[in-house]
UniProtKB/Swiss-Prot annotation:
Protein name as catalogued: Cysteine-rich repeat secretory protein 29
Gnk2-homologous domain location: 33-136, 142-253
PANTHER family: CYSTEINE-RICH REPEAT SECRETORY PROTEIN 29-RELATED (PTHR32411:SF54), CYSTEINE-RICH REPEAT SECRETORY PROTEIN 38-RELATED (PTHR32411)
Organism of this sequence: Arabidopsis thaliana (Mouse-ear cress)
Annotated signal peptide: 1-26
Keyword Cell membrane appears in the UniProt entry: no
Organism taxonomic ancestry: Eukaryota, Viridiplantae, Streptophyta, Embryophyta, Tracheophyta
Pfam families (UniProt xref): Stress-antifung (PF01657)
Amino acid sequence: MSSVFGSVHILAMIAIQLLLIHSVSSLNLTNAYLHHKCSNTQGKYKQGSAFEKNLNLVLSTITSIGNFRDGFRYTEEGEDPNNVFVMFQCRGDSYWSKCPPCISTAVSGLRRRCPRNKGAIIWYDQCLLKISSVASFNKIDYENDFYLSNPKNMSDRELFNKETSALLEKLANKASDRNNLDGKQLVLYAAGEKRIGTKKVSAMVQCTKDLIFTKCFECLEGILRKFPECCDGKQGGRVLGTSCNFRYELYPFLRN
């Protein structure tokens, strides 16, 4: 009798574990590597140089005492010509304890993919990291962006494009609203859902927190103009830059 109950108990535990695995995977809570860019214009630093020492200091600092509460930090170290500027931004649902693992991964990933580059950017699902020898605070980066899209198409492309664009525009307005605050700080992030026919679209937009609200709206407005190029009729898509990004999918991909 006890063996029967033991088997039932084990099967129940397995079922719960499978359910949890399915729940996590259905939310697509991954931290996959997406893309990187190594700057050719800023040159490379030499081993043991002042620039390398400044960079190492900043990177070790942000991974240990970074501002993970709001998932953002912009910091600098050194003096010209060895100034180092570093920025990280975690996704809007990946602050606090969820932010540091992504930043640590990004630091090691950037060192590996862009060794000794003075300027470089790397994107993961849940964060981005940028190093530079040039200051960029409150400046929109119009050059470094890219897009990813689902190869599958919607049957009613025209309706889907119209309604998804409307959702993203609504979220862009919300994210860049000067009254959208967390305490006294601009949120610069918004997420939402919309039913289109039989499908439910989940979407988000976000700006880096060095931007003021007007610059955030300007940045989002710019990348939303790339929707036809990126996402025409696609079941999922995103445009990512270093200053702002958007994403939509036919499945939930954000934490509550």
